[in-house]
């Protein structure tokens, strides 16, 4: 409807990577060029992902919320360290590789599922590349989503894959399971994630 009401429109520019919120068929039929801007926010998303990883593992949002409501719940908020844990990437492009470099410096072990990534790139990043996405969920207590939304990745994160996560780090310490998604929403089945949070399959998301 918006495209039909813009007869002089010649270009739609997306400030980001995903274009699933643009009617590509309608744009094509109207002769309108659609472009995205890959790389424009890479570092910002890298830092946001690291922030979410730290916040979830250290219960920072809960601590902030409790303190603002007048509660002092220090003893109830026992966080764990990222060091010694495995992080699994779903998609290992520019953003995931940037997150991986920081995670590696912290002391995390890197794993990834990306069927389109050359093995040598994963090797250069000291990341174990898996052919089966389920292996990443089985091995990792921290999952970071950095892939495009497609028919292949729609609801890739669901009750079945979440139930595979171990909850125990590579260092043998109980740390719970943590999910960070800085990609398109449709990759995650939100109802399954909510249920996983309620039954504590997931510690945070």
Question: Predicted regions span which residues?
Answer:
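An N-terminal-biased, well-structured beta-alpha scaffold segment characteristic
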Residues: 1-35, 138, 158
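A short helix->loop->beta-strand "cap" motif at the edges of active sites that frequently abuts
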Residues: 6-11, 29-33, 107-108, 167-177, ...
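Phosphate-coordination loops involved in phosphoryl transfer and adenosine-cofactor binding
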Residues: 9, 83-86, 159, 175-176
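Phosphate-binding beta-alpha-beta segment of Rossmann-like dinucleotide-binding domains, i.e.
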Residues: 30, 38-86, 101, 105
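Glycine-rich Rossmann-fold phosphate-binding loop(s) that bind the pyrophosphate
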Residues: 92-93
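N-terminal Rossmann-fold NAD(P) dinucleotide-binding loop
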Residues: 96-97
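Short beta-strand "acidic-cap" motif of Rossmann-like dinucleotide-binding folds
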Residues: 110-112
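Rossmann-like adenosine-cofactor binding region
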Residues: 117-205
């Amino acid at each position: 409807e918006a495209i039909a009401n813009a007869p002089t429109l010649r270009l739609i520019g997306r400030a980001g990577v995903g274009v699933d919120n643009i009617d590509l068929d309608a744009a094509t039929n109207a002769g309108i060029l659609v472009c995205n801007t890959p790389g424009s926010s890479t570092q910002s998303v890298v830092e946001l992902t690291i922030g979410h990883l730290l916040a979830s593992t250290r219960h920072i949002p809960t601590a902030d919320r409790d303190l603002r409501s007048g509660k002092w719940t220090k003893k109830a908020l026992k966080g764990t360290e990222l060091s010694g844990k495995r992080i699994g990437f779903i998609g290992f492009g520019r953003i995931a590789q940037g997150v991986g470099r920081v995670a590696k410096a912290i002391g995390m072990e890197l794993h990834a599922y990306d069927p389109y990534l050359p093995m040598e790139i994963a090797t250069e990043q000291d990341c174990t590349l898996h052919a089966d996405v389920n292996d990443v969920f089985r091995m990792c207590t921290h999952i970071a989503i950095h892939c495009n939304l497609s028919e292949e990745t729609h609801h890739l994160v669901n009750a079945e894959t979440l139930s595979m996560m171990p909850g125990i780090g590579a260092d043998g310490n109980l740390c719970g399971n943590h999910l960070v998604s800085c990609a398109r929403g449709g990759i995650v089945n939100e109802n399954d994630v909510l249920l996983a949070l309620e039954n504590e399959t997931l510690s945070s998301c």
